[in-house]
Amino acid sequence: MYRILLTKRAVKDLGKLSEDVKLRIKEKFNLLLNDPTGIGKKLSSPLIGTYRLRVGDYRVIFDIDDDKVIILRIGHRKDIYK
């Protein structure tokens, strides 16, 4: 089982979102605990992270380090890759 850690930037990103989007993202975090590579998609050009998780129009960018899933960024799909 993996542990989820959020960077300061990810906490800030999450704080800017509406409550319903936060809830949907937190529900997806539970899926990351068991198999982050199974639910996440590997990025072809990992500039800001190695994997992404799709939550509607929002994306969660993360890396995996041993037993940790490190959430790097959270944002709308039109802005997250800039």
Feature-to-residue mapping (PLM):
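A short, surface-exposed loop/turn module that caps and links secondary-structure elements
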Residues: N30-L53
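Generic detection of well-ordered alpha-helical segments
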Residues: E19, L23, E27-N30, N34
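Enriched for short, Lys/Arg-rich terminal
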Residues: M1-K12, K16-L23, V55-Y58, D63-K82
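Charged, low-complexity, helix/coiled-coil-prone segments
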Residues: M1-L5, E27-L31, L43
